[in-house]
Amino acid sequence: DAAAAEGSAAVTSGALLAPVRSGADDKAAQRDAFSIDVQAPPNIADYLTRHLELQRFRELSDLTATELSRLLGAADANARELLGTLGYFSPTLQLEMRETPGSSVAQREVIITVEPGRQTRISDVSIDFSGPIQYDPSAEAQREDIVGGWSLRPGQGFTQSGWDSAKNGGQRKLNRLRFPTGTISHSLADVDADAAEAHLSVTYDSGPAFRFGPLQTVPENTQRYGHEAVRLLARLPTGADYDESVMLQAQQRLASSGYYDSVF
């Protein structure tokens, strides 16, 4: 590689020869291969500057102009993908490269000009359920909590992070009470780029409902204080619907007792 070639020596006619660099070569080696200037609205410019894969090659000082030109082709696709996560699916991009011989920072500058276009807005949201939660009258409040607490509303801007957060937030509410093994069985963000609209749908599969069973202990872990001490501290309500907060409170009581090194 280049570093090995520069650091090695060759023997010719019994003489030890080392490569000689000019002052210009030394200056070039100390500079980055290129700098990146993203010209876009501030929030978009900051996001692209931080996440563009092109940044990984910036400090390769021996990168040639031809190699950088090839990288710019991939950078265009990467920038469009990143803009899509912010809800901009029809942007206009222009990528330019120019030499910067007078710069002490980089040998070249890559200028990325972005016209993001309209941000996609959420048009509608469909939240469905499958499994026992779907028809169980006693689960009505839980269904309403998931639907009513949904964090993305029609008219809001679509972002991938917001979409992921909304889906996961609904699943957490599903898992906290009665259905700890519930999952997202279907989710779709159907984006109409021309209309700048997103149609969201998600289905939560509750899985079976759980109740607290009799407390069981492992003998080798309860030799000192015994099963009864654990039962009195935990106070788990046998036969009651599973409730994550009740479980966490039991764990906290056991941990705070000082009897055990760890509780999980």
Task: Show which residues each predicted segment covers.
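Periplasmic polypeptide-binding modules associated with outer-membrane biogenesis and secretion
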Residues: D1-R50, R56-F264
